[in-house]
């Protein structure tokens, strides 16, 4: 059966990763969490006190401790830097609040985009991020751009943090998400924007199942047309 590549983009906490993981499982596709890759670079930078001008040192650390993905016993995805599992460490608030400046460094983006393209070259990949449809996989057969209100996204992030045992304040999350939106959409390199041929879907008030159904039906239609 012919497979396709699926690109899902959108701002922070728009539901990209949750939806992408479910669709990947349903279609037996590989899910690539590009956001986790930028979080890994951010985690390394913070661990060593590096700033934007230390790009060569951050790239050196990424070469020494390559990013890889695994699966936990419950089937959830795990993230590694070298031999260290960083699945939860890269979701801490300090990483979340610094990932924008790290992901805006052109050399970091170039390195991670090249890694992402290598993984996707054989197809049957579902990838989520902020520039998948525009930069990483411009030839993806299906491109989705998810949006949602700041309030809704802050509520999702608050619940996620609670489930992971991460302390957070709802109003602080709202302001952080709004600030992240501004940074992501105004950066010089690969700003957050929908690809011209992307299907935009507002997930405000829509259940996860509803979003999954919307995207999966479109994916299956394209797959059927290829076979």
From Swiss-Prot:
Enzyme Commission number(s): 2.7.4.25
InterPro entries hit by this protein: Cytidylate_kin, Cytidylate_kinase_dom, P-loop_NTPase
GO cellular component: cytosol
Binding, ATP: 10-18
Superkingdom of the source species: Bacteria
Location in or out of the cell: Cytoplasm
Pfam family, one: Cytidylate_kin
Protein's UniProt keywords contain Nucleotide-binding: yes
Recorded catalytic activity of this chain's protein: CMP + ATP = CDP + ADP; dCMP + ATP = dCDP + ADP
Protein's UniProt name: Cytidylate kinase
Biological source species: Streptococcus agalactiae serotype Ia (strain ATCC 27591 / A909 / CDC SS700)
């Amino acid at each position: 059966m012919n497979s396709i590549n699926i690109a899902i983009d959108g701002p922070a906490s728009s539901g990209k990763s949750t939806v992408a993981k479910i669709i990947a499982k349903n279609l037996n596709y590989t899910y690539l969490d590009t956001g986790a890759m930028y979080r890994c670079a951010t985690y390394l930078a913070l661990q060593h006190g590096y700033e934007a001008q230390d790009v060569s040192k951050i790239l050196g650390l990424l070469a020494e401790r390559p990013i890889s993905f695994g699966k936990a016993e419950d089937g959830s995805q795990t993230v590694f830097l070298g031999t260290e599992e960083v699945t939860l460490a890269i979701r801490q608030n300090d990483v979340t609040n610094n990932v924008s400046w790290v992901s805006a460094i052109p050399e970091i983006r170039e390195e991670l985009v090249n890694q992402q393209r290598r993984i996707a070259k054989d197809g049957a990949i579902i990838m989520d991020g902020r520039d998948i449809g525009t930069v990483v996989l411009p030839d993806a057969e299906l491109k989705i751009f998810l949006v949602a209100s700041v309030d809704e996204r802050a509520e999702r992030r608050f619940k996620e943090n609670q489930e992971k045992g991460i302390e957070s304040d709802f109003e602080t999350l709202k302001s952080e998400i709004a600030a992240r939106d501004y940074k992501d959409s105004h950066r010089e390199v690969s700003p957050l924007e929908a690809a011209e041929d992307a299907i935009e879907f507002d997930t405000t008030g829509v259940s996860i199942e509803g979003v999954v159904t919307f995207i999966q039906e479109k994916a299956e239609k394209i797959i059927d047309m290829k076979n």
